[in-house]
Amino acid sequence: ERDVIQGEGQAYGVELSLRKPRGKVNGWFNYTWSRSLLRSQNEKLADRVNNNQWYPSDFDRPHVLNGTVNFEGDKYNTWSFNFTAQSGRPFTVANSVFALEDINVPIFIERNNARLRPYHRLDFSWKIKYGRNPNRKWVGDWTFTIYNLYSRRNPFNLYYSQRQGAVDSEIFLGSPLGTYELSVMNSPLLAITYNFVFD
């Protein structure tokens, strides 16, 4: 993976946006469909990647959706929901496995031939503004935020391991090579922020 080889890439897509900037309930939604593909250009078989065929780059996310809805309670309180979702990151699944001294070694032929589960998350925030005080030289506000409101276990990466015991419904069904998924921030996370601006 650290070798530098000759190749080419292409990227294309389209973005749609919907906004409501005014009113007690306001917000916006963005949807993007895009592709990011790579292809090696090597005549030597050993230097080819994916047999010189197009394959998704590590940054290929065909579908990305982001949205925010704000509820303006009064001039002091604002509640917001922010949702984000996108296609899973491409990764490479072994095409086969061979045994070498009791160790199962994966064989990779196709590059980025599978994807992690889709990523999505809902965040909530409550912003409390303070009115101007003649005894203070600044104006401040508090923001209370809860990230990952519904405890989504978003995959960060996928790793291979030697399978022991019964075979379940993992990717390598019937193979001695198993997989395990690494997730981060699996539960809601609370953040408190104080912002201030000097007059």
Where are these regions (language model features)?
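C-terminal beta-signal and adjacent terminal beta-strands/loops
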Residues: 76, 84-102, 121, 128-199
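Gram-negative outer-membrane beta-barrel transporters
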Residues: 2-93
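Context-gated lysine
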Residues: 20, 24, 44, 75, ...
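Outer-membrane beta-barrel transmembrane strands
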Residues: 6-15, 19-21, 58, 114-129, ...
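Extracellular/periplasm-exposed beta-strand and loop segments of Gram-negative cell-envelope proteins
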Residues: 1-8, 36-46, 51-59, 92-98, ...
